[in-house]
Amino acid sequence: MLQDTTDSESKSTIEVLQEVRSPLIPENAHVMTVLINHPPGAAGYPPHRLPGGPGFGYMIDGEMLFELEGEAPRVLRAGDAFWGLGGDVIHYQNANNRTDIPCSFVLTLFCVPGQPMLERVTEEELEERKGLRVTS
């Protein structure tokens, strides 16, 4: 949705890139914004969770293969906004979808003091939860 700014001197606009129902935000959470760069063909980070809460992202350059537990993998391109639940949801893929160019994205995360930003998922747990993964 494009916001109208014609009532002001400025010709600036505000474009809403994503709108999400308020996910659970943990008590005492702080917010961290990170820039992630993947070289061409990079596999990204191994399957993980965001223990502190949801993450909200914006693709700056390139393409990313993105997959969350319970959702089919999808390709995100420069200019796309995305988000993923925190807590127990597994983030399976954030790979560079291209072998010829890098990809980069900004991610804003809710974090809980004393917990890591990302928490890796074990092979055993991936096997236990394989029925929750959507493959197409």
Enumerate the language-model features and the residues they cover.
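A short, N-terminal "cap"/entry segment at the start of jelly-roll beta-barrel domains
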Residues: M1-M32, P73-R77, W83, E119-S136
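Extracellular/periplasmic catalytic domains that process cell-envelope and extracellular macromolecules
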Residues: I25-N28, P51, Y58, V75, ...
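Conserved short histidine dyad/triad with adjacent acidic residue
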Residues: M32-L50, A72-R77, L85-I90
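Short, solvent-exposed loop/turn elements at domain surfaces
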Residues: G44-P47, E67, Q115-E119
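Glycine- and acidic-residue-biased ligand/ion/polar-headgroup-sensing regions
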Residues: P51-E71, D80
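Short, well-ordered beta-strand segments in beta-rich or mixed alpha/beta enzyme
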Residues: I60, A78-A81, V106-F110
